[in-house]
C-alpha cells in the first residue's frame, strides 16, 4: 500500500524543496531557516513529542510582525502545492487513477453477474441515465483564479516528469518551468483585494467549462462507450449525452442583493458569448480537418453546386460565419447596444446540431466512420451537453419575497392583504388567477423596488431563449402557496410553458412537512395538468444540519425523500430529487459513491441533480482527467443504485433512527440555542467575526445583519468551526445519541445497521472523516489564547464530548482506529497536518494580536490582518474544505 503513496510523498517533498528555494531567493536564508525549524517542530509534535509541541507554540508566539506574513504564506502555499500533488496523484498512472475509469467496468461486471439482471435491463438503465451538476458560487472557493491556473500548469509539469523515457535535457526544462511557476505563485498575492461580483463568479464557472469540462465530458463519453461496448456489446447513440451542467452563478439571488435581474440578463448573454467562442475553436479545427470530397446525395443537395468540391468544409465555414455573426451581436448587447437580431442568429441547439450531424451521417455512410468518430463526434456531444447556452441557469429566490410581492399587488387592487391571509385563502386566489385569462397586474402600477426586482426577474426568464433557464428554486419553501405563487408570477411575465419550479425544503420542520405539501399540490387539478407528470423537489442539507444537527438532519432528509418517492410513484409522477449538499460534512458532503448508495431506494430513478460547490468544483472537475474520473464515479453509483437498490430499512432500524434523531437534536440545540454561553464562546473561539473581512463570495455572510447563530448562513457557520479544528457542526449531538442507544442495550442492533444498511454506515463513515480532521489540542489552544476564562468550562465540555463520540463510533464500527477502511484519506490528512498545525497556532496568535489592537482602540496592523487572511486560506486548503 505504501508503494502507492511513495510517488505522492516524493512529489510533495520535491515541490516543497522548490518552494524553499523560492523563499530563500526572495527573502533570504534566515526566513527559510525559521520556516524549516517550525516544520520540523510540527512534525515532531505530531509524532507525540510534548517538549517540541511547547517549543512550536513558543516559536510561533514570538514571531515579530514582520515575520508573520512570510511564515504564514510559506505554509499556506505549501498546502496548495500538496493539494496539487494529491490531485495529480488521483489521476496519475501510479496513483488512484489507475483504477478510476475502471469503476464503470467493475460496476458493469458486477451487474452482469446478478442472476436476476439481463443485458437488456442494464442497457435500459444506461439509456435512462441522467446526471445534472449544478455549479454554485459558494464563497468557499478561497483560492484565486490566477493561482488555480498556475496549479493546473504545475500539474502538467508533474505529468511530464512522470514520463519514464523523458530525456535529461527535457527534465531540466520541466524543472525550470516548475521553478518559474512556484516563484510566480509566491510573488502573487493569494488573497483577493475585492469581493468577486456575481459576474466574476459566473466567469469563474465558465473558466471551469473551458479549462476542464470542455475536454473532460467528451473523454468521459468515450470511456463510457468503450466500457459498454466491451461489457455489453452496446454502442452509445451519437445524441446520447447523459450529463448536463447548470449554474447558480448569476441566478441565485437568495439573500444576495447583488444578484439583480440585470445581472442575470448579463450573465445569460455572457454565457452564450462564451459558448460561441468555444464552438468557434472547435469549428476552426473541423474546417481544417474535414477536407474530404466523398459525400452522400443528401449532403450534396444541402451544399448545392457552390459547395460540391469540399462539401464538409463548405458547411463548416457557413456554420463558422453564423457563430461569428452571433458572437458580434452578443458582444454589442453586452456593451449595452441595441441592435436588431441578425438573420441566422443562433438561439437553439438544433441550429448547431443539424449541419454537424449531416456531416457525421454522410461520413459514416461513405465509409469514413473513423473520421466521423474523431473531433466531429466530440463537438456533437458538446452541442448536446453545453449547446448554445453553455450552461443553463437556475433562478433561486426566497419564498417570502414572492409573498411580499403578492401582498403589495393585492393591497393595491383593494382586495385585502395577501400576506396575512390563511393558506386556504392564498391558494383560492392563486388558483383562480392561474385559471384566469386576464392579467393580474394593473398597467400603470408603480411597485416598490423589492417587488419590481421580483417581477423583473420573471421577465428575464420569459425573454431568455427557451432552454437557457433550467429551473426556478424557492428557498425556505413551507406551503403549497409558495409554489403556486411563483407559477402565477411567471404566468404574469408571459411564460407560456411549464417552467420547472422546485420548492427547497431546508429546515427540520420543512423537511418533515415536505411530503404533505407536495401531496396537497398534486391534489390540485390545475397543477397536475401544468406539470405534465414531472416534478422537481430540492432537499436542503446545509440549513437543516445547522438547524438540528447532522444526525437529526440526515434522518429527516432520508425520510422526506422516502415519502416523496412513494407519493410521486403512487401519483404516476416522475420525481427528480435535487440535492443541495455542500463540500463539508456539516453541509451534507460525502464521498459521491457512498452518499448516492445510502439514499432511499428509488431516489435516483428520475436521475441525479446535485449542487457542486465552491472548492469542490476544483477538486472534482479542475482537470479533464479528474472530470472523467468524477463523472465515471457518479455514473456507476447511479447505475448501481437503480439496478441494485439498497434495502428498505427494517422497522426496528427506523425506530432507532427516530430515537437517535430526537436525542441528537435535543443535545445539539441544547448547546447551540439554549446555552447562554454558546454564542459568546463561538464568537471568541473561532475566527467567525474575522471571516467577514475575507473577500470571498458575492453574497453577505448573514441573511440579516444582526442576530445569533440562526441568522448566519450555513457556510460561515461551518467554515468558522473548521478553522479552529473543533469541527463542531459536523458531529455535535450524534455521538451522545449513539452512546444513549448503546447504554439501552442496543449496540448489536447498531452494529447490524452499520453492516447491512448503507444509509447508516455512510453516516458513521462521515463522522469518522470529521473526527480525523478535528484536533483536540489545537481547539484547546484556541481557547487558552482567545477565550475568556469564564467560558473555558464550555470548551472543555465540548472537547470531552468529542472524545467520547470518537470512542462510541469506533466501537459500533468495530474499528481500532479512525478511517481504517480508507487508508488513502487517512494518509492524506496526516501528510497535511504537519503544515496545517503551524497555521492553526499562528492563526490563534494573529487573532489574539488583532483583537488586542482593536480593544486598545488602535488601528489594525496591515501585516497582522494580511497574515490572518493567509492563515484562513491556508487552513481551508489543509482541511480540503471550507464550509
Curated annotation (Swiss-Prot):
Pfam families, alphabetized: PEPcase (PF00311)
Cofactor: Mg(2+)
Any one GO molecular function term: phosphoenolpyruvate carboxylase activity
EC number(s) reported in the record: 4.1.1.31
Entries under SUPFAM superfamilies matching the protein: Phosphoenolpyruvate/pyruvate domain
Keyword entries, A-Z: Carbon dioxide fixation, Lyase, Magnesium
PROSITE patterns: PEPCASE_1, PEPCASE_2
Catalysed reactions, as listed in the record: oxaloacetate + phosphate = phosphoenolpyruvate + hydrogencarbonate
Database matches in Gene3D superfamilies: Phosphoenolpyruvate/pyruvate domain
Family matches, as InterPro entries: PEP_COase (IPR021135), PEP_COase_bac/pln-type (IPR022805), PEP_COase_Lys_AS (IPR018129), PEPCASE_His_AS (IPR033129), Pyrv/PenolPyrv_kinase-like_dom (IPR015813)
Keyword Lyase: yes
Catalytic residues, chain numbering: 138, 546
Gene Ontology cellular-component terms listed: cytosol
Biological processes annotated in GO: carbon fixation; oxaloacetate metabolic process; tricarboxylic acid cycle
NCBIfam families, sorted: PRK00009.1 (NF000584)
Function: Forms oxaloacetate, a four-carbon dicarboxylic acid source for the tricarboxylic acid cycle.
Family per similarity comment: Belongs to the PEPCase type 1 family.
Designated name of the protein: Phosphoenolpyruvate carboxylase
Organism of origin: Salmonella choleraesuis (strain SC-B67)
Lineage of producing organism: Bacteria, Pseudomonadati, Pseudomonadota, Gammaproteobacteria, Enterobacterales
Amino acid at each position: 500500500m505504501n508503494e502507492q503513496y511513495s510517488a505522492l510523498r516524493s512529489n510533495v517533498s520535491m515541490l516543497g524543496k522548490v518552494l524553499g528555494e523560492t523563499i530563500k531567493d526572495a527573502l533570504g536564508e534566515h526566513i527559510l531557516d525559521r520556516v524549516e525549524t517550525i516544520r520540523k517542530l510540527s512534525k515532531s509534535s505530531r509524532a507525540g513529542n510534548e517538549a517540541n509541541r511547547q517549543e512550536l507554540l513558543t516559536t510561533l508566539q514570538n514571531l515579530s510582525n514582520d515575520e508573520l506574513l512570510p511564515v504564514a504564506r510559506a505554509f499556506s502555499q505549501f498546502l496548495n502545492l500538496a493539494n496539487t500533488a494529491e490531485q495529480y496523484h488521483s489521476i496519475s498512472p501510479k496513483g488512484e487513477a489507475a483504477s478510476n475509469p475502471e469503476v464503470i467496468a467493475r460496476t458493469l461486471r458486477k451487474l452482469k453477474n446478478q442472476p436476476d439482471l439481463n443485458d437488456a435491463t442494464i442497457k435500459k438503465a444506461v439509456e435512462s441515465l441522467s446526471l445534472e451538476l449544478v455549479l454554485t458560487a459558494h464563497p468557499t472557493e478561497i483560492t484565486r483564479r490566477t493561482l488555480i491556473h498556475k496549479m493546473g500548469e504545475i500539474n502538467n509539469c508533474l505529468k511530464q516528469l512522470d514520463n519514464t523515457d523523458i530525456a535529461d535535457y527535457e527534465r531540466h526544462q520541466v524543472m525550470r518551468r516548475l521553478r518559474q511557476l512556484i516563484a510566480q505563485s509566491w510573488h502573487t498575492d493569494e488573497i483577493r483585494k475585492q469581493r468577486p461580483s456575481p459576474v466574476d463568479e459566473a466567469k469563474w464557472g465558465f473558466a471551469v467549462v473551458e479549462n476542464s469540462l470542455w475536454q473532460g465530458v467528451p473523454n468521459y463519453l468515450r470511456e463510457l462507450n468503450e466500457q459498454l461496448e466491451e461489457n455489453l456489446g452496446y454502442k452509445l447513440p451519437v445524441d446520447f449525452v447523459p450529463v448536463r451542467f447548470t449554474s447558480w452563478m448569476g441566478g441565485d439571488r437568495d439573500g444576495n442583493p447583488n444578484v439583480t435581474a440585470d445581472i442575470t440578463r448579463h450573465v445569460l448573454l455572457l454565457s452564450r458569448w462564451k459558448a460561441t467562442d468555444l464552438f468557434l475553436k472547435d469549428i476552426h479545427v473541423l474546417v481544417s480537418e474535414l477536407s474530404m470530397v466523398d459525400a452522400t446525395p443528401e449532403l450534396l443537395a444541402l451544399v448545392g453546386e457552390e459547395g460540391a468540391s469540399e462539401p464538409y468544409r463548405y458547411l463548416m465555414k457557413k456554420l463558422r460565419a453564423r457563430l461569428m455573426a452571433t458572437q458580434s451581436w452578443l458582444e454589442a448587447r453586452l456593451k449595452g447596444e441595441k441592435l436588431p437580431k441578425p438573420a441566422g442568429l443562433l438561439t437553439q441547439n438544433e441550429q448547431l446540431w443539424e449541419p454537424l450531424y449531416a456531416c457525421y451521417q454522410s461520413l459514416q455512410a461513405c465509409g469514413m466512420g473513423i473520421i466521423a468518430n474523431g473531433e466531429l463526434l466530440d463537438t456533437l456531444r458538446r452541442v448536446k451537453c453545453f449547446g448554445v447556452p453553455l450552461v443553463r441557469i437556475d433562478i433561486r429566490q426566497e419564498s417570502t419575497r414572492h409573498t411580499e410581492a403578492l401582498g403589495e399587488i393585492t393591497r393595491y387592487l383593494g382586495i385585502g392583504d395577501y400576506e396575512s391571509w390563511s393558506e386556504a385563502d392564498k391558494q383560492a386566489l392563486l388558483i383562480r388567477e392561474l385559471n384566469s385569462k386576464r392579467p393580474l397586474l394593473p398597467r400603470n402600477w408603480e411597485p416598490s423596488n423589492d417587488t419590481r426586482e421580483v417581477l423583473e426577474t420573471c421577465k428575464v426568464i420569459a425573454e431568455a431563449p427557451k432552454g437557457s433557464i433550467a429551473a426556478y428554486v424557492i428557498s425556505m419553501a413551507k406551503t403549497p402557496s409558495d409554489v403556486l405563487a411563483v407559477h402565477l408570477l411567471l404566468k404574469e411575465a408571459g411564460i407560456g410553458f411549464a417552467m420547472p419550479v422546485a420548492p427547497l425544503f431546508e429546515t427540520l420542520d420543512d423537511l418533515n412537512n415536505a411530503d404533505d405539501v407536495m401531496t396537497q399540490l398534486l391534489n390540485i387539478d390545475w397543477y397536475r395538468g401544468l406539470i405534465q407528470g414531472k416534478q422537481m423537489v430540492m432537499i436542503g442539507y446545509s440549513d437543516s444540519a445547522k438547524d438540528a444537527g447532522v444526525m437529526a438532519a440526515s434522518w429527516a432528509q432520508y425520510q422526506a425523500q422516502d415519502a416523496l418517492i412513494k407519493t410521486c410513484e403512487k401519483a404516476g409522477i416522475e420525481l427528480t430529487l435535487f440535492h443541495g449538499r455542500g463540500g463539508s460534512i456539516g453541509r451534507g458532503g460525502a464521498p459521491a459513491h457512498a452518499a448516492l448508495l445510502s439514499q432511499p431506494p428509488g431516489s435516483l430513478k428520475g436521475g441525479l441533480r446535485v449542487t457542486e460547490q465552491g472548492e469542490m468544483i476544483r477538486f472534482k472537475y479542475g482537470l479533464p482527467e479528474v472530470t472523467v474520473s468524477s463523472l465515471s464515479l457518479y455514473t456507476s453509483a447511479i447505475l448501481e443504485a437503480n439496478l441494485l437498490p439498497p434495502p428498505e430499512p427494517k422497522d426496528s432500524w427506523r425506530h432507532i433512527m427516530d430515537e437517535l434523531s430526537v436525542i441528537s437534536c435535543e443535545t445539539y440545540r441544547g448547546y447551540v440555542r439554549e446555552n447562554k454561553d454558546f454564542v459568546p464562546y463561538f464568537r471568541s473561539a473561532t475566527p467567525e467575526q474575522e471571516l467577514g473581512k475575507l473577500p470571498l463570495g458575492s453574497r453577505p455572510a448573514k441573511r440579516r445583519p444582526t442576530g445569533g447563530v440562526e441568522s448566519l448562513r450555513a457556510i460561515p457557520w461551518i467554515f468558522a468551526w473548521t478553522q479552529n479544528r473543533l469541527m463542531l457542526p459536523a458531529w455535535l449531538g450524534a455521538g451522545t445519541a449513539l452512546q444513549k442507544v448503546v447504554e439501552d442495550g442496543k449496540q448489536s442492533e447498531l452494529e447490524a445497521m452499520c453492516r447491512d444498511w448503507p444509509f447508516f454506515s455512510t453516516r458513521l463513515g462521515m463522522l469518522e472523516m470529521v473526527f480525523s480532521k478535528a484536533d483536540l489540542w489545537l481547539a484547546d489552544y484556541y481557547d487558552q489564547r482567545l477565550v475568556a476564562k469564564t467560558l473555558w468550562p464550555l470548551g472543555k465540555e465540548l472537547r470531552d464530548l468529542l472524545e467520547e463520540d470518537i470512542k462510541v463510533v469506533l466501537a459500533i464500527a468495530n474499528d481500532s482506529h479512525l478511517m481504517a477502511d480508507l487508508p488513502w484519506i487517512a494518509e492524506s490528512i496526516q501528510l497535511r497536518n504537519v503544515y496545517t498545525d503551524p497555521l492553526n497556532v499562528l492563526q490563534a496568535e494573529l487573532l489574539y494580536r488583532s483583537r488586542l489592537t482593536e480593544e486598545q482602540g488602535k488601528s489594525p496592523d496591515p501585516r497582522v490582518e494580511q497574515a490572518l487572511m493567509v492563515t484562513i486560506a491556508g487552513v481551508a486548503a489543509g482541511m480540503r474544505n471550507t464550509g
